Amino acid sequence: MSQFVLEIGTEELPARFLPALERELAERFTRALADAGIECDPVRVMSTPRRAVVRMDAVNPVQSESEEVVTGPPARIAFTPEGGLTKAAEGFARTQGVEVADIFRLTTDKGEYIAVRKHMGGARSIDLLRDICPAIIGALPFPKRMRWGSGDFTYARPMRWLLALFDESVVDFEVGGVRSGNITYGHRIHGAGPLTVARAGDYERVIREQGGVTPVGEERRNAVVKGGNALAVAAGGKVIWKDSLLDEVQGLVEHPVPCLGNIDPSFLELPREVLLTSMESHQKSFGVEDAEGRLMPHFLTVLNLTPLDGDLVRKGWERVLRARLEDARFFWKTDLASSFDAWLASLDNVIFLGPLGSMGDKTRRLEQLCAWLAAEVGFDDATAAARAGRLSKGDLVSGMVGEFDTLQGIMGGIYARRMGEAEAVAAAIAEQYLPAGPDSPVPSSMCGALLSIADKADTLAGCFGLGMIPTGAADPYALRRCVLGIARIILEHGLQLDVRGLFAKAFALYGERAWKLAPEDALVKLDEFFMARLRNLFIANGYETLLVEAVLAAGCDDVRSAGARLEALAAFSRRDDFASAVLTFKRAANIIRKQGGDSDVALDGAWKADLLVEDAERQLAASLEAMFPRFDGLWAEGDYPALFGLLGELRPVVDGFFEGVMVMSDDAALRTNRLNLLQALVGRLSRLADFGALQM
């Protein structure tokens, strides 16, 4: 077996491009090699800011061979009466690229035809790779592309060299004016090159030993963590590792060297969040804390070289960070000299969204919506909820958030505490933007949960009223995240809340607006949007799609109820008699669905005892009369597992009804009475789930 390596050398790529680039290269090469019939071990991909590398340590040097029988025209038109070949047969041979002598007769179920055997494959893998490599490189997707020089070729950053080796042979091709060869370049300081690679198998040794490059991202990450931990422990602390920043940092360096710097202890008067954000956002550095979780006057950064004078480099980093922290301290002191009243007045000059007014208008709506929500869910501190809504956006015009926009909400909570607001109000302001993503926690406080719901509902109502409905991947106002956030908060806090009523109230608080969609139409679309996202959330949480759809079809205005019903139905589905129960109740639901629309008499679920002539229908009526009070009591308690247990008890009686009674009797009175029996049953069933939507 042979070895292959491809290195795409560029100017520094953004760190965020590297994970997707590695995935694309692995998937595209794996697919292209399989399509070409080139057998190889799994494709390995690694990357640094200046290179993307594809390696295969065991590649078949020759394409797989196969034989294919190609059928031509029927023998009766391929041969003359004398046995010679007709023009049709000669044309077939010419089309297939074979000699006429290769034609033979083939008997099939449809008769006798002519055919040829074609031998496929057998090409040299290196020859096939000459076409595969440039095709893949040119098709790689990037968030942004650029041109350089005078050519039209585009890539994420200017391409400077291409190394492509199959064993010791160069895979010769050209992309964007750059021709492949056996030359690579190492770290700009520790092994710039050019470096010659004699064989594909030598590449990694050369780039590591001569080039001073650590080509594998996971190795760079581990080196940062190991070295950083050692430095922090020596200083009596531990590094505050942040995974997203760690991933970014390893993608910024080829030769990672952790470096521990110091900050003036006086800066520790700043809030922890401000210090960490200053370090992380501007300097790509990590904070250091002691065993009690208190910040220490140190930071950890990662260099892209081993410096000749480590102290000099460290002092340079300290000087730059000090300037950042001086700015942060200025904003902190300036903001503390201001007040929420001043900020709220300024919010009237900050636009929320076009026709939707100012951020000041939004805070006044949130004040009312939070108070309404508190009453709806039975929260006993409506005053705190309303106050949190009113102050929620004040920090947007503060100096600190103007400098560090990721601290919005967080700084509002900190300032609220410093300015004497109640703890519930401060906590709610700090938590208002949670959850920030699918894996982010929801607000921990009830006041924060209500403010977060109100904020998201207000945004959703306004955007849908303006026709700003997400389509495809486009969602500039993160409305999908808003919906998922509302659903998660309701589920995780166990709130009994009518979301349709929530959205209607949010629309009403806007008053008269120049809506693009009438509020009633926008509400319908918002309900559909919410149900679709709730469906996705339940499925992502591991529930079967059919069960989710059956529960949501029974109603999802009360998200807590929908979640509890789904959990109970999932448990019921694991019972041995589940399939039988579904078939029974599905039959009842389907009959009512069909006959309810066709019947001349409206079905209201009220049957007449004097029209119960069969034992089976009398037994069903008696069972329903006994069950309904139990059902209604359990429904009021929200005991859905017990409700599904009731259905299990009832199933044999319903089966007996279907076996012993002709529902669609010729007697109209009997038919209507029997349909009403089923309507009474289905009316209760449909509160739990739409059994007609289940498939067995």
UniProtKB/Swiss-Prot annotation:
Catalytic reaction annotation: tRNA(Gly) + glycine + ATP = glycyl-tRNA(Gly) + AMP + diphosphate
UniProt entry keywords in alphabetical sequence: Aminoacyl-tRNA synthetase, ATP-binding, Cytoplasm, Ligase, Nucleotide-binding, Protein biosynthesis
Known EC number: 6.1.1.14
TM helices/strands, residue ranges: none
UniProt enzyme class: ligase
Predominant localisation class: cytoplasm
GO molecular function, one term: glycine-tRNA ligase activity
GO cellular component: cytosol
Superkingdom of source: Bacteria
InterPro entries reported in the protein's UniProt record: DALR_anticod-bd (IPR008909), Gly-tRNA-synth_bsu (IPR015944), Gly-tRNA-synth_heterodimer (IPR006194)
The UniProt record lists the keyword Aminoacyl-tRNA synthetase: yes
GO biological process, one term: arginyl-tRNA aminoacylation
Protein location: Cytoplasm
Self-association and partners: Tetramer of two alpha and two beta subunits.
Family the UniProt entry places it in: Belongs to the class-II aminoacyl-tRNA synthetase family.
Protein name: Glycine--tRNA ligase beta subunit
Organism of provenance: Nitratidesulfovibrio vulgaris (strain ATCC 29579 / DSM 644 / CCUG 34227 / NCIMB 8303 / VKM B-1760 / Hildenborough) (Desulfovibrio vulgaris)
